[in-house]
């Protein structure tokens, strides 16, 4: 799938393993992996950061193959899921950083244009999450309160 506001085609992607079974050399059980997920979530890590740590440090290629559920679903079952979806959170964080840059560099027209693109992606993603009932129907992105959301 191509990029929304860039000319790139976005062809690079990670390859999923062909077999969906748990590798024989993996000694962690489903409960061990879940405990590790809860421990990392309590430290304040996002689901993708948890997945990277489990992959690199514990040898769990896909949490879904071991536990039967994705990381976010496991976190939701315990009530540890983040209140904002991760992709929306990172877009808001990027918009706050660009806005902070614009306060120091008022004449940066390109940054002003990129901020408009970032905020349009935020609005589009928020509209999607409202239809999927992940966000409250009255949730609204306001640039004045955005820095409080990501702090």
From Swiss-Prot:
Q: Name one GO molecular function term.
A: small ribosomal subunit rRNA binding
GO cellular component terms?
cytosolic small ribosomal subunit; nucleolus
Localization annotation = Cytoplasm
Keyword Cytoplasm assigned to the entry: answer is yes
Swiss-Prot/TrEMBL keywords: Cytoplasm, Ribonucleoprotein, Ribosomal protein
The text of the family note is: Belongs to the universal ribosomal protein uS15 family.
The record, for PANTHER family, names:
RIBOSOMAL PROTEIN S15P/S13E (PTHR11885), SMALL RIBOSOMAL SUBUNIT PROTEIN US15 (PTHR11885:SF6)
Give a short account of what the protein does.
Component of the small ribosomal subunit. The ribosome is a large ribonucleoprotein complex responsible for the synthesis of proteins in the cell.
Quaternary structure (record): Component of the small ribosomal subunit.
Q: Give the protein's recorded name.
A: Small ribosomal subunit protein uS15
Q: What is the scientific name of the source organism?
A: Gillichthys mirabilis (Long-jawed mudsucker)
């Amino acid at each position: 799938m191509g990029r929304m506001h860039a000319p790139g085609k976005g062809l690079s992607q990670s390859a999923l393993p062909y077999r969906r079974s748990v590798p024989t050399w993996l000694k962690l059980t489903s409960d061990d992996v879940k405990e590790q997920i809860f421990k990392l979530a309590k430290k304040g890590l996002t689901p993708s950061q948890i997945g990277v740590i489990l992959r690199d440090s514990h040898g769990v290629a896909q949490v879904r193959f071991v536990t039967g559920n994705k990381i976010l679903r496991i976190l939701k079952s315990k009530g540890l899921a983040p209140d904002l979806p991760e992709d929306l959170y990172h877009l808001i964080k990027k918009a706050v950083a660009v806005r902070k840059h614009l306060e120091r560099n008022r004449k940066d027209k390109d940054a002003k244009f990129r901020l408009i693109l970032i905020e349009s992606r935020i609005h589009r993603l928020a509209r999607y999450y409202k239809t999927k009932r992940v966000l409250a129907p009255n949730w609204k992105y306001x640039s004045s309160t955005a820095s409080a959301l990501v702090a």
